[in-house]
């Protein structure tokens, strides 16, 4: 039985390290750590099939823009007959503090357009790993446009990379359906802020 691990993001070099591409960054790190083969394009997505210990896994990066993420995920899940309980979506979440990780199954999409697209095509009964990017830190009392914020690059990329490494290190707990244990393991011991580190 396959597991489908999909990271949400936007294609293109200009978006590579943006907050909205946290999902892509996590999937890339998983692929690197577990020696997955190079991604190839199928069904409007980049996919790679490999193993995480004893688990057979398909990594997916929808190669559509965020608002259309659901279609390639639905196509791949249908092709490989993957049940919703074996689908894990990694995505950014503005309502969660920076570099805080939350896991849930089902529930609302909190206005996230990538999740809306998936919900519309697959329903809601899949797993979500929510990577906190927080809301903009505004010390000047100027209004910061949320779409500009999520499409901008992280400032504290070191904290992001450390958090992603924690996710990758404990990913098997998610595959074993142990979300509470996973969240405990990936909890950062210090509170990070997404501000320039230099």
From Swiss-Prot:
SUPFAM superfamilies: Peptidyl-tRNA hydrolase-like. The keyword Signal does not apply. The keyword tRNA processing does not apply. Coiled coil: none annotated. Signal peptide: none annotated. Pfam families: Pept_tRNA_hydro (PF01195). Its main location: cytoplasm. The record marks 92 as: Stabilizes the basic form of H active site to accept a proton. The active site is at residue 20. Monomer. Belongs to the PTH family. This is Peptidyl-tRNA hydrolase. It comes from Ehrlichia chaffeensis (strain ATCC CRL-10679 / Arkansas). The lineage of its organism: Bacteria, Pseudomonadati, Pseudomonadota, Alphaproteobacteria, Rickettsiales. The gene is pth.
